[in-house]
UniProtKB/Swiss-Prot annotation:
Gene3D superfamilies: 1.10.8.60, P-loop containing nucleotide triphosphate hydrolases, Winged helix-like DNA-binding domain superfamily/Winged helix DNA-binding domain
HAMAP family, A to Z: ORC1_type_DNA_replic_protein (MF_01407)
Pfam families per record: AAA_22, Cdc6_C, Cdc6_lid
Family statement drawn from the similarity comment of this UniProt entry: Belongs to the CDC6/cdc18 family.
Annotated PANTHER family: CELL DIVISION CONTROL PROTEIN 6 HOMOLOG, CELL DIVISION CONTROL PROTEIN 6-RELATED
The protein's name: ORC1-type DNA replication protein
InterPro entries in the record: AAA+_ATPase, AAA_22, Cdc6_C, Cdc6_lid, ORC1/CDC6, Orc1/Cdc6_arc, P-loop_NTPase, WH-like_DNA-bd_sf
Single annotated GO MF: ATP binding
Amino acid sequence: MSITLQKQETDQDPVDAILDTAENGKSVIRNREMLRFTYIPETIHHRDGEQRNVTHSLSPILKRSRPSNLLVYGKPGTGKTLVVKKILQKIQERVKRSDFPIKLVYTNAKDETTLYGLLVSFGRQLGLDEKELPPTGLAISEVFKRLIKAIDTGRTNAVFVIDEIDYLAHLVSKTRKDVLYQLTRANERIREGSLTIVGISNDLAFKERLDPRVLSALSEEEVVFANYSVDQIRMILEDRAGEAFVPGAVSSSALNLCAAMAGREHGDARRAIDLLRVAGEMAERAAADGVTEGHVRDAALKIEENKENTALRSYPLHEKLVILAVMRSKGSSTGEIYSTYRELCRLTGQAVLTQRRATQMLSDVELSGMVSGRITHQGIHGRTKKFKLTVPPATVREAFGDDLILADII
């Protein structure tokens, strides 16, 4: 019996089996690129007003005038980045046909772990090489000075688009390096050329945490993106499915379910498109004729599991210990969490970091969404912030299970 089974298993290499299916099997997806969040469609549905407002705000740059600083708000998946990138793309096409010294610079603040890295990203897109702007080693003030000089000497009209600018504000708060304030005052130091800031934020309350001086300069104009309705998401999905899948491959009920699931999450079109993509990939792997509701439900589970697991595994050791301390403390204050963290360090033989540093890590983990904090009132003792996990403890245990240092305390 075992010999027969072994022979059956070795009849065909498992890699070849998968590649044969990919090469010769059924394919329901004909253009995967259209299901990526980076894809910019020619038509962005239900965002005509927002496109007009952002374009009006940025269009003075084509007349060699400085556009007003702009803040773009809206929850994730409401089309903010898509609209801004489309407009930048169209402006760039016109710039190429002229001799205007215009630079459109885009960066996502969350992709950079330090303020230095963020400023270097701006510099590279302005054309500064490693000699002119080293990847490390300069003071923040010197990096900023070199950015201003590049704009000034090139007589450049520059637009810095900062996606997830709320994360930059968090970095500023953490390092006490007021880069946002310096960026908003940069034009006072630029004799030739100009700098405009476009900030994109998922956090509608973000500006309430800004220094009033920064807010005044940064929000010269504002555009708010409302949530998509379920019907609007359905129309977006129909459009993408028609281009990305072979005709008739996606059932109407599957599209409805994708739209309904995304609609429950504040109208997140990005999640809806991601669901459709993963559901399509699962249908192909199963050699199915098309995408069904079952594929969509399976895709939703897979996306959630992968997202949380990957994020948890990526944390450094001491942030993992802080997360475990929150899990063990169950809704406790920073002081109680720090006490548990110290005990976990003792059990794992790790050097204990200061309470200030541990509290900072707790704030970083909260920002990433793995824990949530809530202010509670405690009578004469005033207010305190209580923290709890936003993911199931079982997910944490699974993600940290391969870490040999943590194995004995999970």
